[in-house]
Amino acid sequence: MNWLDELKWDSQGLMPAIAQEQGSNDVLMLAWMNREALQKTAELGRAVYFSRSRNKLWFKGEESGHVQIVHEIRIDCDQDVILLKVTQTGHTPGIACHTGRHSCFYRVYENGEWKVTDPVLKDPQTIYK
């Protein structure tokens, strides 16, 4: 059996993928992968996702230069969620979020509202030309 066949893909052939920073263990982002994206990620050693809005493979960093080097690919106990242990490149500290922040999880719920807790490290207008 092919290793990709052991996974439980959803009805659209997709699976959520969490990118976690190697070393700090910060959760950087959640994206989606199809079989081809996961296969390319394993082959290339860099994160390749599937863009649901563009309906195509998304090579992380192809526009921004903020590539994710993949050190390890894990699967959860139900075999329906992927975890990538990555090094975020292209800026120090690494920028994973399209808003110019280190992580896409930069808002925290406090006292009935969402508060921004993490700074913008680079203006998104200068990231995406």
UniProtKB/Swiss-Prot annotation:
Note on cofactor: Binds 1 Mg(2+) ion per subunit. Binds 1 zinc ion per subunit.
EC number(s) stated in the UniProt entry for this protein: 3.5.4.19
Pfam families reported for this sequence: PRA-CH
UniProt xrefs under InterPro entries: PRA-CH, PRib_AMP_CycHydrolase_dom, PRib_AMP_CycHydrolase_sf
Native source species: Albidiferax ferrireducens (strain ATCC BAA-621 / DSM 15236 / T118) (Rhodoferax ferrireducens)
Keywords attached to this entry: Amino-acid biosynthesis, Cytoplasm, Histidine biosynthesis, Hydrolase, Magnesium, Metal-binding, Zinc
Name assigned to this protein: Phosphoribosyl-AMP cyclohydrolase
Pathway where it operates: Amino-acid biosynthesis; L-histidine biosynthesis; L-histidine from 5-phospho-alpha-D-ribose 1-diphosphate: step 3/9
Domain of life, per lineage: Bacteria
NCBIfam families assigned: PRK00051.1
